[in-house]
Amino acid sequence: MNKILITGSSRGIGFELTRQILRKDHFVFATCRTPDSAHELKLLHNQYPNRLTILKLNVEDEESVQSCFKQMEQDGESIDTLFNNAGIIDWSNLEQIEAIALEKIYKVNLLGALLVTRHSIPVLQGSDSPLIVNLSSRLGSIELRGGTKLGGAIAYQCSKAALNMLTKQTSIDLEPYNIRVISQSPGWVKTEMGGNEAKYETTEAVTMMLDSLEKLPQDKTGIFIGEDGKEIPW
């Protein structure tokens, strides 16, 4: 049985990751900003009281992040896989985006992942094969943007491109700890962020993601893959 920690787990892809991983008989630390109002997570906890722990963690607040992992470390906990899933989107284009909105997106999508990664190192070291999965997007691929020339969501696209660099750099920085780091795009998913026109239902996207991660070779790190496991250009 593996131990998995997921940020932003109260809804969308994070919640579905939690649900499907529990069905695979693993243990899940489901984190979110306000556990008291995470009603769906609470219902899930009623189903899996011995394998689901709900933790308070606000990726925008370093004290919150540090406190969460410090408590886990003191409790002797470890995690095998970390999903940096928490994220937000703004569809504004170059002429529309406001500075405060761009700062907010970077704080959640990039800084949040950095803080969680940094403070999770001690509990990841308790695993024989620790893995960090940063939830990215094809919208963060510089090469693909050049091919399609799609506009809009400029802050989100930039934040995911930056997240991919975080993946690459931390895969190097964490190599001495034997911690692997990858980026994975879930595809275009029907969530609050993705909208109703998206390609995948949440259940389908997460099933594909988890299947591809189970097949990921143990020596793979510092790569960007899709929901199908195929590599995506940076």
Map each language-model feature to its residues.
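N-terminal Rossmann NAD(P)H-binding glycine-rich loop of SDR-like oxidoreductase domains
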Residues: 10, 14-19
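A short helix-coil junction within the Rossmann-fold of NAD(P)-dependent oxidoreductases
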Residues: 24, 75-76, 92-93, 119-128, ...
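Conserved glycine-rich Rossmann-like NAD(P)H-binding loop of the short-chain dehydrogenase/reductase
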Residues: 24-40
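The beta1-alpha1 cofactor-binding region of Rossmann-like NAD(H)/NADP(H)-dependent oxidoreductases
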Residues: 56-67, 99
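Active-site Tyr-X3-Lys motif and surrounding loop/helix of classical short-chain dehydrogenase/reductase
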Residues: 67-71, 92-96, 100-107
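Catalytic loop of short-chain dehydrogenase/reductase
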Residues: 88, 95, 99-103, 125, ...
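C-terminal helical subdomain
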Residues: 176, 183-184, 195-234
